Structure formats: C-alpha cells, structure tokens
Amino acid sequence: MWKMIGASLLLLAGQAYGSQAVGCKARLKAVDEQLVEAKAQKNGDRVAGLERAKRNIQAYCSDEGLYREQQQRVAKMQQEVDAYLSELQQARVAGRPDRVADKQGKLDASQLRLLEAERELLALQQLIGKS
C-alpha cells in the first residue's frame, strides 16, 4: 500500500514539475506581474509594497541562498514526517482506530508537503548547477 501511495505521489509531482518556476528571476517575474495588476487597479498601497519587494529581491536574493533555505526547509519537513510516522505507529500499537485515521491523514499531508519541497529543491539545484 505504501509503495502505491508513494508512486502516485511521485507521479503527481512529476506532472507538476515543469509548471513552477523557481529562483530569484521567477520571484521577480511574479512581483512584476502583481505590480502590473496593482497599477491597473490603481492600488497605490499595494504598488508601493510590491515596488519595495522588487527592490529587496534585486538587492538581496540569490539562487544559492534560496537553495540553502530550501535545504533547511526540506530537513525540517522530513523531521515532521518522521514524527507523524512515529505517532501513527504509537496509535496502531495502542489500538486506537480513530487516532490511527487522524495520524494517517496528517502523515499523508506532511508527506505531500515534503515531496513538493523536495521537488522545489531539485529545481533550485538544477538552476544553480549543483549535482
């Protein structure tokens, strides 16, 4: 069963892989798109905030820095998955079907978030050329 779930998650992640841009250029592009919308809506406060965000991205964003941050995020999410797996095993040992279902749901959601974070890490890794 676990192999089937893992395979289906990998399939979903593979389908979404090319659809999300990563890196500083992608962040800058997203802010630029929002900036165009905010200007069209004549939303001065939002324009000011987005222009500030754009300046910060241009000044401080680096793909290597994003890669390091994403590595930390993935490690933290892996710890979360491990904790939910431990809680699920404890609920099974205790014979609590209600808790087993709850812990299984939390584990599944956590694994999905981890998979998405790993996919983004891989995209950043390819962007900066690390193997």
What feature does the model see in each segment?
Residues 13-18:
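N-terminal signal peptide c-region/cleavage motif recognized by signal peptidases
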Residues 4-12:
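Sec-dependent N-terminal signal peptides
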Residues 19-39, 44-131:
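C-terminal-biased regions
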